[in-house]
Amino acid sequence: LSLVGGFHGRTGRPAQFSDSTRASYRAHLATFRGQEDLITVPPNDVDALRRAFAEAEAKDVFIEAIFMEPVMGEGDPGMAVSPEFYAVARELTEAHGAVLLMDSIQAGLRATGDLSVVDYPGFEGLPAPDMETYSKAMNAGQYPLSILAMTEKAAKLYRTGVYGNTMTANPRAMEVGCAVLGMVTDEVRANIVARGHEFLEKLQALAKELDGPITKVQGTGLLFSCELDPAYKAYGTGSTEEYMRLHGIGVIHGGANSLRFTPHFEVTSAEVDLIVQAVKDAMVNGPRRPAT
């Protein structure tokens, strides 16, 4: 079971559990066809989640795992799972013998300055997931490093020698990860939260000022997005994304038609203003879809 709009990777089962790319993968990759083993529910819909487990049980279907991102990075950038929804997911997986895996690869430290979802504000005291994955910010964006954290219960299922890859347990990767964690001070964590709030406030004000081009602003910490009116093309040739990159802003698209932002952890208020002004410039002076 995964969430509508969720994204978990491009290979193997994580790709199969990725709702946001499932249709595209099926269209182009034969190995993804004929698989009807994924249940999806809308994020933060507690009733739908409970109903999915009840219906599966009634049909004698075993839900082996829930995959979900604490903050979405691809399908609906910046959309956060609520503590209530997480708590119910944890409750149901424990009751049904399923695994709860939190995919924090994109969110990680970027969302609140905390590594694990159970350290996010509002999640303190909730039981940990069975597994949680980290990467991206943990490797400073420079070195191949990903981490799988497990509870003691999940670790008992792990078999040494069965899982691995060429880069596993790489000493240099470990040094990079430790160095990054050492640089994430209390001041950096506070900046992640404060600048995240500032970005949202200023982008929401811009959306109101422009009255139309930006249809939604959402985010958690320094993972946030602006959804654009269909008159604007978020990505591809002749897009808003391309225009902003050519004007010095490293933005990337996400969702159906959104601009996704992941600024560095020590971003300043002056840089916030610069980025917001660049968004305004792109909306006012950048490309639009040809009128039909």
Regions found by a protein language model. Give the residues of each.
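PLP-dependent enzyme catalytic core of the Aspartate aminotransferase-like
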Residues: D186, P263-T292
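Amphipathic alpha-helix from the class-I
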Residues: K153, R172-N191, E266-A270
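Active-site PLP attachment segment
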Residues: R10-P14, G122-L157, A169-M174
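Conserved PLP phosphate-binding loop immediately N-terminal to the Schiff-base lysine helix
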Residues: E69-S82, G97-F123
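Short acidic, glycine/serine/threonine-rich loops at helix termini
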Residues: R10-F17, P77-M79, R110-L115, Y143-M150, ...
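Conserved PLP-binding catalytic core of the aspartate aminotransferase-like
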Residues: G196-E201, L210-Y243, F265-T268
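Helix C-cap/helix->beta junction micro-motif
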Residues: L92-H96, L210, H247
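PLP-dependent aspartate aminotransferase-fold enzymes
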Residues: L1-A65, E84
